[in-house]
Design a protein with these regions (language model features):
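Compact integral membrane and secretory-pathway proteins
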Residues: 1-136
Length: 136
C-alpha cells in the first residue's frame, strides 16, 4: 500500500506541472497553461489508465497500463506543443512558432513525465511481473 501511495504521489507531482504556463508570447499577458492538455480526451483517458495501473494487482497488466498511460500523456503533451497555436494565433501548422512561443515550463513538464516513467520502469524491473499479486 505504501508503494502505491508513493507511486500515486509521484504521478500527481508530475501532473502538477500542468498548472504552469506552457505557451505564450509575453509573460503574464498571453499565457496558456498546461491545463489545455485536459481538453484532449485521449490525455484524460491516459491519466485514468495510469491510475488504474497503479492501483490494480495484475503484475504485467498493471505495468502495461502504466506504461501506455504515461507514454500517451507524453505524446499528448507533444501534440499540444505542435498544435496549440493553430486555433489561437496562426491558423496553420508552424513549427517555428511552436518553438518560439514555448516556455521552459513545458520542457519541465515533459522531463518530469519522462522521469516518472523511468522511476516506474525501474521499480517494475526489480519485481517479478509473472506473479499476479499485490506489489506492495
Amino acid at each position: 500500500m505504501k508503494i502505491k501511495l508513493l507511486m500515486t504521489v509521484i504521478f500527481i507531482i508530475s501532473l502538477s506541472t500542468m498548472l504552469m504556463d506552457w505557451f505564450g508570447g509575453q509573460r503574464g499577458v498571453q499565457d496558456i497553461s498546461g491545463l489545455i492538455l485536459l481538453n484532449n480526451p485521449i490525455a484524460v483517458a491516459c491519466i485514468i489508465l495510469t491510475l488504474i495501473g497503479i492501483w490494480t494487482h495484475y503484475g504485467e497488466t498493471s505495468y502495461m497500463l502504466i506504461y501506455v498511460g504515461l507514454t500517451g500523456i507524453m505524446m499528448m503533451e507533444i501534440y499540444e506543443f505542435l498544435t496549440w497555436h493553430i486555433l489561437t494565433i496562426s491558423g496553420s501548422f508552424n513549427l517555428a512558432l511552436s518553438f518560439d512561443w514555448c516556455n521552459p515550463e513545458f520542457y519541465i513538464a515533459v522531463m518530469s513525465m519522462i522521469a516518472t516513467l523511468l522511476i516506474y520502469r525501474y521499480y517494475f524491473q526489480k519485481m517479478d511481473l509473472t506473479k499476479s499479486q499485490d506489489y506492495v
